[in-house]
Amino acid sequence: MFEYAPAPESRSVVDIKPAYGLFIDGKFVDPSDGGSFKSINPATEEVLAEIAEAGSGDVDRAVRAARTAYEKVWGPMPGRDRAKYLFRIARIIQERSRELAVLESLDNGKPIKESRDVDLPLVAAHFFYYAGWADKLPFAGFGPNPQPLGVAAQVIPWNFPLLMLAWKIAPALAAGNTVVLKPAETTPLTALLFAEICQQADLPPGVVNIVTGAGETGRALVEHPGVDKVAFTGSTEVGRAIARSVAGSRKKLTLELGGKAANIVFDDAPIDQAVEGIVNGIFFNQGHVCCAGSRLLVQESVADRVLESLKRRMAQLRLGDPLDKNTDIGAINSAAQLARIKELSDAGAAEGAERWSPPCELPDRGFWFAPTIFTGVTQAHRIAREEIFGPVLSVLTFRTPAEAVEKANNTPYGLSAGIWTDKGSRILWTADRLRAGVVWANTFNKFDPTSPFGGYKESGYGREGGRHGLEAYLNV
């Protein structure tokens, strides 16, 4: 393995304040009960900032501000004028992309090259894309006069904090809605910096409101009677609870939940290319990806070759400081998530699967887990059935295409899948039979703002991205 000199990105581009308030009606304000919590750097366990915790009264203030802005300013505003604000936000994101990328890596633990080269370009692209839709809604196929829903409550996860914010806020604003957004409690900082960007863009007060806190804050937001739309990305367990709480109300709901994607490698696949796709599919963002290719289904005749090449490639991965530009695998986002990964990995070994990790020195401080694969996995193993949400790959084999499809679909989830083969006809045959919302062919984890994203079964319902993403925020 090549030795690389450290290439750290400077923290000096980011000015992290000691404490942050709630962003309500265009201003940062203190919570009504004075509650707060700490946001920490998962790579070092260093406290980054003290974050205000919103209570039910604060959530009510935010929803009322959003309602006023919707009725008096944003809702009546012509689409071409809304577009100007979205274009302005997109340009500011581009101008401040280095600052945002560094802050994302500090707060989340992901490698800087991922936040810099993947997350931030996609964030800006989503705002640019939906800015272009804002004045074209009557011609988008939703009827001659589609109308916004009103106030959208949005709850986002910790794995792609700023990108999930863009997925939620950009289409909502383009459609004429106002927003109250709650970021995950472990990764609030880029959402709060986005609030500053809204101020910099002169976005009218109340159009975007950001309330920080844990589960109780999210529950108060989702259950608030002044909300017209709920959009949630996160675990299937929480998604079920939200669906129950919204049932019987007038609120529209979009859920993007867990996944246990199958990455299928046929015997005619280009092995080296497939191995790169396998590594990207499961170790990108430390496996903290809802659509991660966490189940590798490889045809028996090439299984040994694929595994040999995969282990050789895994030995080249560099784990360490997320701000080092050479780092491939950063820190696990929290102690709780690390415990979950360890629990399921230990269960895999206890149930008889063979565990392998490359030689890997883990830092003394922070939350770390070495990239890991399990072979000898059966469909009865917990590691083949449950979402681990970490850098852990379960390897299963198959003999025929029909068996591959049967095993791939044998999961309560249905978010994504990957197919690796040299035959276009086999790609089409397999994709047609996979019960997954997104199917990649000879690639993995490719995203674009023009493409809808979402799943089936326990992976949720509704689509985000593309023209489809607008429909979730319109009365059609």
PLM region spans:
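ALDH superfamily catalytic-core signature
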Residues: 237-378, 441
